[in-house]
UniProtKB/Swiss-Prot annotation:
One of its GO terms (molecular function) is nickel cation transmembrane transporter activity. It comes from Helicobacter pylori (strain J99 / ATCC 700824). Mediates influx of magnesium ions. Alternates between open and closed states. Activated by low cytoplasmic Mg(2+) levels. Inactive when cytoplasmic Mg(2+) levels are high. It catalyses: Mg(2+)(in) = Mg(2+)(out). This is Magnesium transport protein CorA. PANTHER family: MAGNESIUM TRANSPORT PROTEIN CORA. The record marks N255 as: Essential for ion permeation. Its main location: membrane. Belongs to the CorA metal ion transporter (MIT) (TC 1.A.35) family. The chain crosses the membrane at residues 260-280, 292-312. InterPro entries: CorA_cytoplasmic_dom (IPR045861), CorA_MIT (IPR050829), CorA_TM1_TM2 (IPR045863), Mg/Co-transport_prot_CorA (IPR004488), MgTranspt_CorA/ZnTranspt_ZntB (IPR002523).
Amino acid sequence: MVNVFFKQQKFVIKKRFNDFNGFDIEENEVLWFELINPTPNELATLSQEYAIHYNTDHSQRVSSVTKYWEDSSSVTINAFFTNQDENETFHMEMATFILSNNILFTIYYGTLEIFDSIQKKVLASPKKFEDGFDILTKIFEVYFEKGVECLEWINKQTSLLRKNIIFKETSTHDDILVRLSNLQEFNVALRDSFFDKRRIITALLRSNKVDSDTKNNLNIILTDFSSLVESTTVNLNSLDNIQNLFASQVNVEQNKIIKLFTVATMAMMPPTLIGTIYGMNFKFMPELEWQYGYLFALIVMAISTILPVIYFKKKGWL
């Protein structure tokens, strides 16, 4: 599927095509081609009509170290974005941006919610968008705003998790570990994504294809992403502190359990000794002939069990 955004007088118009067949818009009017789950035929047409090369091997694009490169006619960018699925699970998705003749081509598979936000802004404020570089700049701005929202969510979840651990609320240890691990992974993914955007923007600032006004906006966005990277570092430290706090709490609980079993063992040793004595097969044991000998032995066992417990409590070991 192809979404095309083009200028028409003072407005930006969006048209949707199933492929490039029937496409009748003048090239100088087009701002943005958005290709969603493109077929090989669509990519071949794109390459033929607009002299754009796109690597169709997804695994090579993902594993490629080069996220930005340009030649005499175009700029190509591979960037990662956080995305939320139906189960409210965050993960990273990659999108490719190609800028050629001031037209932006975006190619991605699946669903990226950031592009829905971009479309609304482009259609609502057409005067702000004169070429593909303006749209790309706005994509970075919107992603910065999304990043701020994600970091605020992490901060909130981190605070709740800390309270859960300190006040020993209903969550089990397994639940706490899962939540902590998810927050750490999401924060690291955001951090990598922000680093990714900083590298891309820095490369764009060096390009002679970008005009001065766009570079001024990119400089501001670059500073914004640097602040987000610092925030992710703070979050990492907070999550590490929570992990240490949780580990300390688990150690304390384990020590209590060990202490309890130690006390129980010590408390049972005297009555066991007493029972062992009366289990000896000596011929002369007066208590065996005594009418209340059995009751006497039970009382002595009970007293010998209680006395160590009282002693341990006075010592503060229980």
